[in-house]
Amino acid sequence: MVRVAINGFGRIGRIVLRIAMKRDGIDVVAINDPFITNDYAAYMFKYDSTHGRYDGEVTHDDKDLIIDGKAIKCYQERDPADLPWGDNDIDIVIEATGVFTAKDLAEKHITAGAKKVVITGPSATAPMFVKGVNDDKYTSDVTVISNASCTTNCLAPLAKVLQDNFGIEEALMSTVHSQTATQKTVDGPSKKDWRGGRTASANIIPSSTGAAKAVTKVLPELEGKLTGMAFRVPTVDVSVVDLTVRFAKDVTYDEIKAAIKKASEGEMKGILAYTEDAVVSTDFLGDTHSSIFDASAGIQLSPRFVKLVSWYDNEYGFSARVVDMVELVSKA
């Protein structure tokens, strides 16, 4: 049984806990969040506006969050180096604050006594691994890894199938992305991104994203061939990747569909999914796949030029991959 701690009990931290508690072999024994008291942690875990009420018993005391009778120790330390991970025999820390994404900052958990760290977001300095794409390259000597971003986890499996089967000459990605906690409820200051400071619930907001660039980190053969942007839209969850691709050789849309369907039933089962149904975004709430290819939504202009569409629950699907990475790291 791998002993796990979660640092940061926000959207991803709480959903990761929901998923981890259903996995055999993972024991979440501690949570740290300096901004949340135990009673508030219990409330936020129990009630979720997007994914619904937790189907179980949630209580707390002065020291613990108690879920279905299981006590999870709670701490409120600002500096990860001050956490008692050694005293708690923590094997892996899930770094979910969005603050300690740099490798040297995440290593504070190791200073505190943990053995390894999985960062729930892209990192400029820690190696990134995407399930189904390059996770087979992970080696046990690597102590800090990044699980990349929700959008990278959607795009990378799709891009890998396309690259392996047809060769990508160049590609542009747009993600139509649900609003997140970094956005504003009303117009407010956002010095680095003026548009990002506009009211999230009233606007479609063009934005930058590092997701496409991150894909080239896990698929180096696409370096210089892929970039992208985002549109933030007023939905609470579920996003969709729009990928426009120029292939290196002629291909039919049926061949593209067949290759993706084959991968979804084979080496990428559980990661990449395939549908021909007339779906919309809410159909994917709670979906644990990284990427769900929408075969009936794509279009083709010429034998080498196509637009492909793939959905993802940017909260639940990504959180499922975080837990997968914990399992990978624990077994390596």
UniProtKB/Swiss-Prot annotation:
Recorded catalytic activity of this chain's protein: D-glyceraldehyde 3-phosphate + phosphate + NAD(+) = (2R)-3-phospho-glyceroyl phosphate + NADH + H(+)
Pathway: Carbohydrate degradation; glycolysis; pyruvate from D-glyceraldehyde 3-phosphate: step 1/5
Gene Ontology cellular component list: cytosol; extracellular region; fungal biofilm matrix
Species for this entry: Candida glabrata (strain ATCC 2001 / BCRC 20586 / JCM 3761 / NBRC 0622 / NRRL Y-65 / CBS 138) (Yeast)
Amino acids binding D-glyceraldehyde 3-phosphate: S149, C150, T151, T180, T209, G210, R232
Gene3D superfamilies listed in its UniProt record: Dihydrodipicolinate Reductase, domain 2, NAD(P)-binding Rossmann-like Domain
EC number: 1.2.1.12
Residue sites binding NAD(+) per the record: R11, I12, D33, R78, N314
UniProt name for this protein: Glyceraldehyde-3-phosphate dehydrogenase 1
Pfam families, sorted: Gp_dh_C, Gp_dh_N
